[in-house]
């Protein structure tokens, strides 16, 4: 449902503008096309035409990755984030529509639905406002006010409220103050009159305690007290009154936490020591602090409350229902105070507790999904033979040797560390495996004994004695010619150039210890988070039914180096350890966001159709578990796919699914080279025409900058009609879906400066497209509603570098060899580190002492930082300075200020 976030000025202004929009949803519960799109366009500040196009595509069954990648003309070039925002708001609108239908049905059954009330409900676009409208009609348990109504006291209560709104001056004489109340009481007979008149001394104006007089003696189950209960409930259900209290919470709510005394000295409570006596304005409370307090509350350690200035709020409420002074005014004032304390304030406090938790959840989920995206898009090593080592002491180091496809070749356990200390046997075994299985890289888990294992492996790879330090540099082994390899200084260690480094090391070794020619096997530290959970999962048991959990864990570590994305999709993202308070947030929202993130990453990278696992295929646009399983079955029965067209032969994979998935699936050895690119099959005819016009094959065209420079882009542009629908007509079909031949040529309206043969080797494709765009009328832009510029731009970019991997290249990293434990740290020393987690309050960095240090957001950069992800990324190699070390709590404070990265 659409919810306010009621403690921010920006949100307050935004909500007011949304209320003023006054757009309605139809009775069906589905957002009406025009009004729904208009509301989304207004809320997200996006063009209405683009929003309408996205909603149309979503309703046609298109996925977000497909829309953002292959329908840029129709959406005006909206990116994946914007399309996701549209989709999520549209879903909330649909939920709001369903809630309206439920409310209308309930009120209709009570025979209280008027045309005005129905129109008001339809016009409401905010869930909080909708619930306020519904509150007087909402079925309740038997309240004090209902008991009073059953005794016929509602007319009396309404009469008192009406009289209290009439301005009156304070009586000059005490005996005149009760005249109005007496006249009201004369209209009512029975116990109600007797009870109320006996408790209110007519003739003496009874003022409330807050006004300086004695409080009214109305209490218990008397009819008079029950009449005031009716007034209190009426006030509590008044939308204006509730908004008055909300405004007070928006502007001045304070969240407070205090430790429960009996828990203060327990070990479990110490992690919440910062919140034993804590208070802060709610609007300034960061999500991680709020979630920490709520966790402490859930564990029975903290007591958390949200408060406002009650006296000021009661005064504001009273002015809404009382004018002047008198007995009726005093009675209503007392009822208003009772309403605030007993009904409104607890309700609004609970509302703000819920909404603040939702806001904190959203921020925590955002941090988690961004970290997950960075982790999934970590650079892969690629198809190399890998030796994976899961380090350990007493239980030994588990080793798995993998081939280029990640298949298990061999596994065993070595014991180079205490208590066994079988260094010689372990060294011989390691060298034997490297040579036997032609190992090209080594992956070591970053858990227990990781530093010791990395040093052991490094010594085993080098036949020379251990390196010694000389004046801040490593002592260098002699080359066969007696030369020296220039080693890197401390400042260089965080960012090694892998190919250059391997070349230097290779030249220094005699002979180099590597399974294949080209230098020593590089060593990488790999995160173990989630590996143990994967090794015991049904997925791992299905993949390796005959191996134990330790071997499966080592295999997972090796595969994470080869292709992090392909391996991590098998693991529950919550087990990967890159979030903050992920177990405290709304789990359904978290799962939805994480699934969307995984799908986005998988489709951004693309998937090898012939080697992808079931889990990887599941996240491909348009597929899902059932179709992914059918693809695996088809592949097992018929062998590898040779073309994308074969996908149509897969069971239950129809035209729609093919359209959605084809562009994201790659076939490296396909007959048509475009099948191994991001060019969608619906655009093959454009590339075919380009090749035909250049009198070459598609294979010759791909990657050939000279030929690409000769392409006259204007020849392949197709005019696009405006997105706006007029007179009920459907939007014109996307020209990218045209079949049969190249798009018609546009008339010449100006020359495009074509490049000479001398310029073609230095083709700058973006610049070339920019020149073409500037020469066109209309310009090469999806937003103009003109040519298919975005699609052509993507096609030409893909032809220049087909099948490129957006994830970059993996880098070698080295910890400081002098630092192994907390006791080795010295305040002020600079160290290399790896970013292991990012939160909205800073980043955690592994510096090799088995305890990550925190770089607070204020220490991330020399400039002011509001979002850590703007200056740092997960697994980034950084240099940090030690600021503080707390040995008792095992906490390390680090800084990146004034350090060149």
Spans of model-derived segments:
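Long, highly charged, low-complexity intrinsically disordered interaction regions
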Residues: 36, 95-112, 119-122, 533, ...
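Compositionally biased, intrinsically disordered low-complexity segments enriched in Pro/Arg/Gln/His
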Residues: 5, 173, 196, 217, ...
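Duplex nucleic acid-engaging cores and interfaces of nucleic-acid transaction enzymes
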Residues: 2, 66, 82-85, 92, ...
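Single-stranded RNA-binding regions, centering on S1/OB-family and related RNA-binding modules
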Residues: 675, 681, 686-717, 764-768, ...
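Structured, non-catalytic alpha/beta "coupling" segments that mediate domain-domain communication
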Residues: 106, 120, 130-134, 296-309, ...
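A glycine-rich phosphate-binding loop feature that marks nucleotide/adenosyl-phosphate handling sites
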Residues: 247-254, 389-393, 447-449, 526-533, ...
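Short flexible coil/turn linkers enriched for glycine and charged/polar residues
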Residues: 47-48, 60-61, 127-128, 141, ...
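Glycine-biased, low-complexity coil/linker segments
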Residues: 29-30, 174-177, 208-211, 219-221, ...
């Amino acid at each position: 449902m659409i919810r306010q976030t009621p403690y921010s000025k920006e949100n307050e202004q935004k909500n007011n503008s949304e209320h003023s929009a006054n757009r309605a949803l139809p009775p069906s519960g589905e957002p009406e096309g025009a009004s729904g799109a208009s509301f989304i366009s207004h809320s997200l500040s996006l063009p209405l035409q683009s929003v309408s196009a996205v909603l149309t595509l979503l309703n046609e069954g298109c996925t977000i990755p497909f829309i953002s990648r292959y329908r840029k003309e129709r959406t005006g070039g909206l990116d994946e984030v914007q399309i996701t925002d549209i989709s999520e708001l549209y879903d909330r609108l649909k939920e709001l529509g369903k809630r309206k239908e439920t409310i209308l049905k309930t009120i209709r059954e009570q025979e209280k639905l008027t045309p005005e009330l129905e129109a008001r409900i339809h016009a409401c676009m905010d869930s909080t406002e909708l619930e306020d409208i519904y509150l007087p009609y909402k079925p309740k348990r038997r309240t004090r006010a209902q008991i009073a109504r059953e005794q016929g006291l509602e007319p009396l209560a309404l009469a008192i409220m009406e009289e209290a709104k009439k301005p009156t001056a304070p009586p000059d004489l005490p005996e005149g103050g009760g005249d109005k109340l007496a006249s009201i009481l004369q209209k009512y007979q029975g116990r109600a009159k007797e009870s109320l008149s006996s408790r209110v001394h007519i003739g003496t104006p009874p003022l409330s305690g807050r006004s300086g007089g004695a409080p009214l003696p109305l209490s218990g189950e008397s009819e008079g007290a029950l009449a005031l209960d009716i007034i209190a409930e009426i006030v509590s259900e008044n939308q204006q009154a509730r908004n008055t209290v909300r405004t007070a919470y928006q502007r001045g709510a304070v969240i407070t936490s205090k430790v429960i005394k009996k828990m203060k000295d327990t070990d479990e409570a110490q992690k919440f020591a910062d919140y034993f006596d804590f208070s802060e304005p709610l609007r300034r409370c960061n999500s991680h602090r709020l979630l920490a307090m709520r966790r402490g509350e859930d564990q029975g350690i903290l007591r958390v409350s949200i408060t406002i200035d009650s006296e000021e709020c009661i005064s504001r409420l009273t002015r809404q229902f009382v004018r002047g002074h008198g007995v009726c005014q005093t009675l209503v004032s007392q009822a208003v105070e009772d309403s605030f304390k007993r009904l409104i304030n607890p309700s609004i406090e609970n509302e703000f507790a819920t909404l603040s938790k939702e806001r904190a959840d959203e921020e925590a989920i955002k941090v988690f999904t961004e970290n997950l995206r960075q982790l999934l898009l970590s650079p892969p090593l690629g198809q190399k033979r890998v030796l994976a080592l899961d380090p350990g002491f007493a239980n030994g180091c588990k080793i798995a040797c993998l081939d280029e496809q990640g298949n298990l070749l061999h596994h065993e356990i070595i014991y180079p560390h205490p208590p066994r200390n079988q260094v010689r046997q372990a060294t011989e075994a390691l060298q034997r495996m490297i040579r036997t299985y032609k190992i090209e890289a080594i992956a070591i888990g970053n858990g227990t004994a990781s530093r010791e294992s990395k040093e052991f492996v490094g010594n085993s790879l080098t036949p020379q004695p251990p390196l010694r330090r000389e004046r801040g540099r490593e002592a260098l082994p002699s080359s066969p010619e007696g030369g020296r390899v220039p080693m890197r200084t401390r400042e260089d260690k965080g960012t090694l150039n892998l190919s250059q480094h391997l070349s230097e090391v290779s030249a220094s070794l005699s002979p180099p210890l590597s399974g294949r020619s080209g230098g020593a096997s590089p060593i990488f530290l790999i995160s173990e988070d989630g590996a143990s959970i994967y090794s015991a999962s049904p997925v791992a048991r299905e993949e390796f039914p005959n191996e134990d959990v330790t071997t499966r864990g080592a295999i997972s570590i090796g595969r994470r180096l080869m292709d992090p994305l392909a391996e991590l999709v098998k693991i529950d993202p919550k087990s990967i350890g890159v979030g903050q308070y992920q177990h405290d947030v709304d789990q359904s929202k978290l799962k939805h966001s994480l699934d969307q993130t995984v799908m986005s990453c998988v489709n951004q990278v693309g998937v090898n159709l012939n080697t992808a696992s079931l889990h990887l295929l599941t996240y491909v646009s348009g597929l899902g578990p059932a179709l992914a399983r059918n693809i695996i079955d088809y592949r097992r029965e018929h062998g590898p796919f040779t073309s994308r067209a074969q996908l149509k032969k897969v069971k239950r994979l129809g035209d729609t699914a093919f359209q959605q998935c084809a562009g994201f699936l790659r076939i490296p050895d396909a007959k048509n080279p475009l099948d191994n690119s991001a060019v969608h099959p619906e655009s093959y005819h454009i590339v075919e025409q380009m090749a035909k016009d250049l009198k070459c094959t598609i294979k010759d065209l791909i990657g050939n900058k000279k030929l690409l420079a000769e392409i006259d882009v204007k020849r392949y542009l197709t005019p696009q009609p405006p997105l706006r629908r007029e007179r009920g007509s459907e939007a014109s079909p996307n020209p990218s879906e045209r079949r049969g031949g190249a798009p018609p040529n546009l008339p010449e309206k100006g020359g495009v400066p074509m490049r000479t043969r001398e310029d073609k080797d230095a083709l700058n494709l973006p610049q070339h497209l920019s020149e073409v765009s500037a020469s066109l009328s209309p310009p090469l832009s999806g937003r103009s509603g003109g040519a298919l510029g975005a699609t052509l731009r993507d096609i030409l970019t893909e032809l220049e570098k087909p099948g490129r991997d957006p994830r970059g290249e993996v880098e070698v990293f080295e910890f400081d060899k002098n630092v192994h434990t907390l006791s080795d740290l010295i305040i002020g020393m600079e160290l290399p580190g790896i970013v292991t987690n990012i939160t909205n309050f800073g980043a955690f960095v592994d510096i090799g002492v088995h305890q990550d240090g925190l770089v607070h957001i204020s220490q991330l950069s020399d400039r002011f930082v509001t979002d850590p992800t703007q200056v740092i990324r997960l697994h980034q190699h950084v240099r940090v300075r030690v600021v503080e070390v707390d040995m008792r709590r095992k906490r390390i404070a680090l800084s990146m200020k004034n350090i060149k990265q």
